[in-house]
Amino acid sequence: MRPAILRERDVPIPLPDGVVLRADVYRDPAAGPRPVLLQYTAYDKANWASVYGVINPERAVDHGFVVVVADARGRFRSGGDEPFRPFAGSGEDAAACVGWAAAQPWSSGQVGMYGASNNGVPQWQALRRRPPALRTIVPHFTASEYDSGWVWRGGAFQLGFNLWWSLANLAPDQLRRATARDGAAAHQDTARALAGALRDPDAAFGRLPLTDAPALDGIAPHYREWLAHPPGDPYWHALSARDALSATDLPVLHVAGWYNVHLDGNLAAYEAIKAAGGPAAERQRLIIGPWTQWSPALFGDACGPERRFPAAIDMEGLQLAWFAQHLSGAGGPELPPVRVFVMGVDEWRDEREWPLARARATPWYLHSGGAANSRHGDGRLSRTPPEGPQPPDTFRYDPRDPVPTRGGATYLPNPAANSGPMDQSAIEDRDDVLVYSSDPLTGPVEVIGPVHAVLHLVTSAPATDVTAKLVDVHPDGRAFLLCDGIRRVTAAEVAAAGSGPVRVEVDLIATGNVFLPGHRIRLEVSSSSFPKYDRHAGTEDGTATAPEDLRPARQTVVHDDRHPSALVLPLVPAEDPAEEPAP
């Protein structure tokens, strides 16, 4: 008979500075002390998705755990007068919550943490402080450093995610708290602007300068702080947990998604711990599924609006088994070091390491007769390098008419309908998108691992952006996005090249896909993906204060024998098969 489950609401957790957090505790009142699973959330402990989206507390109680879901400082039911700032201070508070949970009479003193997206941040921040009772963490879809792994990408600002997440996920509760504290009149302009931005997010994305975000005035100071601190700034180093990774002794179950906006941050944390060879290096596990940032069936069949993967996996059961092993000393089968979902053949694969040792970084070279514009042009991808001169390809980048974002690793309005593997055919009809495609494949081509493009660019602008996408073209012409990247080319790089091309390496992060016979491998090259990334203004520093500051640029991609531009793919040889597919 299933035990009765007690849910204690708004249990106080006092912090050392006197602030009181509020938590909901799920437990079996008839049981003795048990290990605790802690989620420290910025997303409301009363919200169904926040509570049940990663682990069902009732199932966890059935498996012998106590579950504590605590609202973060400055969020929802918890105390704290200052506006919530993502990353800042979450480590001290999360570590205090770990200590509190370990000291309760219903606790065995062993604590594990879990949670996705921003709820993964306090896990890494707690790891920096290593409270004695913390035994393991299971961060989903998150990062341990926040400039390159969260806010910026390739030097560009991740406008779509940063602004929409701030507007939709953070600002409403921040406005509620500020209004309760100061009165409605004090924040009426912000309230009006927020309602307008949520109603018409495209207008919010298009505002210039980027700091012009009236919907966040007085309630979300982090947004302008982020814009004021470019990647590599000491501001980010102070927030990062990266330095703690090499010395950690904690086992970590890393959960990532091919179409998740934080995939690069997920992989960077895993790789950093493994590369350091420290006490926890062999106790890391990595799972990568075909998931987006927000999937309606996150661990069931993963689906975008246009393509579906039969990716059902009992991720909840895997997590509970992991926690039983590391908090209770339970036996049972070990997870493989790496488990990845391979798209195309649509199967789970167990691997020994990440990146795969047997994968070979293989260039596919760009060729054309000088007219690779759009999917109707003459751009080709080939394993054969260019011989002698080739005419370059040129397009006009206009920041007033940027290439629109369509799917991929995004978090934009209506995320279920605008993320994941979406057809890029309409994008590829544009003349400001260069398209290079292989011949139809005669056999399967397996690609698992990091992806990048090396491009040789001449620009008429003092500085610019280069974007790249890897696409799987089906025999019926549909062109599904696998991964993408951006690289902000600086004025110093352009000046150093003189009249010649700048060598630009664009990091597309990673994918796991088998291109099936009859399919084609495709690379798209352009200079924008808006609103995923902010528009480069064509100015020396890339910024604009008003639309009239936006300057078009003539972009030329060179691909001759002296400047061999290429898409570099991690090919898995067919004669060296992977381990057995996962059950």
Which residues fall in each region the model found?
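N-terminal cap/lid segment of alpha/beta-hydrolase-fold proteins
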Residues: 1-30, 437, 441-443
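Glycine/threonine-rich phosphate-binding loop and adjacent beta-strand/alpha-helix elements that clamp
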Residues: 7-12, 303-304, 310-318, 327-583
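Cap/lid segment of the alpha/beta-hydrolase catalytic domain
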Residues: 29-102, 152, 297-307, 428-430, ...
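Accessory cap/linker subdomain of secreted extracellular hydrolases
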Residues: 53-54, 62, 128-247
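A catalytic-pocket lid/entrance helix-loop region that shapes and gates access to the active site
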Residues: 89, 114, 121-189, 258-259, ...
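Active-site-adjacent alpha-helix of alpha/beta-hydrolase-fold enzymes
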Residues: 264-284
